[in-house]
A protein has these predicted regions:
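Conserved beta-alpha-beta core of the PfkB/ribokinase-like small-molecule kinase fold
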Residues: 64-156
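Conserved small/polar residues in nucleotide/adenosyl-binding loops
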Residues: 159-160
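Conserved N-terminal subdomain of the carbohydrate kinase-like
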Residues: 2-96
Length: 160
C-alpha cells in the first residue's frame, strides 16, 4: 500500500472514530456478530434491528444502512425495503450485499427491485453476483463465485 493511500486511509479511520456513525445492519444470522464487531472495531456503532415495525425508525436515526441477502425471508425482505425507503428519504448510504443472487431467483428479483427503485447506493458483491445483477450468465457454486474481483469490477464499470 502506498504512503498516500495509507495516509488517506488513516484520515478516513480518524473521521469515522470521531463521528462514531450508527450503522444499521439487516444482515444474515450467520454473520451478524462478525458484522457488529467489525463495525465496532472501525469506530462506528452497529444496530441490528430487522423487525419491520421498527426499521424505519431505526434507519432514520442511522448514518448508513447495510442490507445482506445471506439468509433471506419474506419478512426480512419487507423490513429491508422499508428500511431502504427510510434511508433514501434521509439521504444516507445503502450498501447491498447481494449474497447468492446468481443461485436464487427470489434473491435476484428482490435485489433488482431495490436497485431499480433507486434504493441502493453501493453494491458489495462478488463476480458472479455482479454479473447476475447485470442479468448476465453468472457461474458460481452455492453463493460462491467462480470469477475474480477484477472481472466483476470491470463488468460493473461498463454499465456506468
Amino acid at each position: 500500500m502506498s504512503l498516500v493511500i495509507k495516509g488517506q486511509f488513516g484520515l478516513i479511520v480518524d473521521a469515522v472514530r470521531e463521528k462514531r456513525p450508527v450503522i444499521h445492519h439487516l444482515t444474515n444470522y450467520v454473520t451478524a456478530g462478525d458484522c457488529a464487531n467489525i463495525t465496532l472495531c472501525a469506530g462506528a456503532s452497529p444496530v441490528m434491528a430487522d423487525e419491520a415495525e421498527e426499521v424505519a425508525e431505526i434507519t432514520s436515526n442511522a448514518d448508513a444502512l447495510v442490507l445482506n441477502l445471506g439468509t433471506i425471508a419474506k419478512a426480512k425482505m419487507q423490513a429491508m425495503e422499508i428500511a431502504a425507503v427510510a434511508a433514501k428519504n434521509k439521504g444516507i448510504a445503502v450498501v447491498l450485499d447481494p449474497v447468492g443472487v446468481m443461485a436464487s431467483k427470489l434473491r435476484l428479483v428482490f435485489a433488482l427491485k431495490l436497485l431499480n427503485e433507486g434504493l441502493v447506493t453501493i453494491v458489495r458483491g462478488n463476480y458472479a453476483e455482479c454479473l447476475a445483477l447485470l442479468e448476465e450468465k453468472a457461474e458460481g457454486k452455492g453463493v460462491d463465485s467462480n470469477g475474480n474481483v477484477t472481472d466483476g469490477l470491470r463488468a460493473v464499470s461498463y454499465t456506468h
